[in-house]
């Protein structure tokens, strides 16, 4: 029991710091906030300092999280499996929207689909798992591409070979013009650009570094996407991609 109490004391102290409270705390403050006596707090802090889990400012003697925490958190984040985390949420999204939902990631200079949940319309279109497409090939791809850093975007654009899926397919030039709009709105649209009769809306997923790592799209038969349905699907898509991003360690805010 004594060992358990000691472990709980350590956790209580470490949990005083979170992403919303990046502050330094003094010995008295920590003791008051946790209800642990100062002598015990001091011993715990000294032990945590040895392992670089906390650091102390020599000027004001206050404590904050150390680089050891960063190493531990990085190990956790590296083991996060995007598809495993996203799949149950994408199933919920598909159920809520009653449309097909797809998930894809970057594969060198292209986009590859890694998950798909069919909607009630069971429409067949160019987004099977394992399918590789250029970054102008659909809403999910464009959503991810537009949120890459400018250096990567320029690199991909230079190697991009244009392919027409339909008469409405947008090539390199149109994609460049669309990037700013997608970044501003937080979502992308694909209006029969890959499959005739199919409309899709896409949004990115971010990781703990704030980097775009994936794109999600809600797609269905264009005739069923009334302005009202499109707005509902957009809100649901942004909500669910934000939830997935948070689970991947992202700390930014959701787009409205």
Task: Annotate each PLM feature.
Residues 1-79:
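N-terminal helix-turn-helix
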Residues 3-7, 27, 62, 66, ...:
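Short, structured helix-loop boundary elements
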Residues 16, 33, 85-96, 185, ...:
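Amphipathic alpha-helical regulatory segments at dimerization interfaces
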Residues 30, 41-44, 48, 54, ...:
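Hydrophobic packing within well-folded, soluble alpha/beta domains
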Residues 61-159:
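Amphipathic alpha-helical effector-binding/dimerization core
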Residues 155-156, 238-256:
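Cysteine/selenocysteine-centered motifs that mediate thiol-based redox chemistry or coordinate metal-sulfur cofactors
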Residues 168-240:
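Extended hydrophobic
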């Amino acid at each position: 029991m004594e060992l358990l109490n000691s472990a709980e004391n350590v956790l209580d102290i470490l949990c005083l710091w979170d992403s919303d409270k990046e502050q330094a705390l003094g010995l008295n403050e920590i003791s008051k906030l946790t209800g642990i006596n100062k002598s015990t707090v001091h011993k715990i802090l000294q032990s945590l300092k040895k392992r670089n889990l906390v650091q102390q400012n020599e000027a004001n003697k206050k404590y904050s999280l150390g680089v050891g925490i960063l190493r531990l958190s990085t190990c956790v984040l590296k083991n996060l499996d995007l598809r495993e985390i996203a799949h149950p949420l994408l199933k919920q999204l598909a159920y809520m929207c009653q449309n097909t939902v797809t998930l894809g990631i970057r594969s060198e200079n292209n986009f590859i689909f890694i998950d798909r949940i069919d909607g009630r319309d069971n429409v067949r279109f160019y987004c099977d798992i394992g399918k590789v497409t250029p970054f102008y090939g659909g809403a999910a791809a464009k959503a991810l591409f537009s949120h890459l850093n400018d250096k990567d975007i320029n690199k991909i654009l230079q190697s991009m070979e244009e392919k027409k899926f339909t008469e409405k397919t947008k090539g390199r030039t149109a994609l460049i013009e669309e990037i700013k709009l997608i970044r501003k709105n937080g979502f992308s649209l694909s209006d029969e650009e890959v499959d005739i009769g199919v409309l899709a809306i896409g949004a990115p997923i971010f990781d703990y570094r704030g980097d775009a790592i994936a794109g999600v799209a809600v797609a269905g038969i264009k005739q069923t996407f009334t302005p009202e349905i499109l707005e509902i699907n957009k809100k649901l898509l942004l909500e669910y991609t934000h939830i997935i991003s948070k689970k991947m360690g992202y700390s930014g805010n959701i787009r409205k």
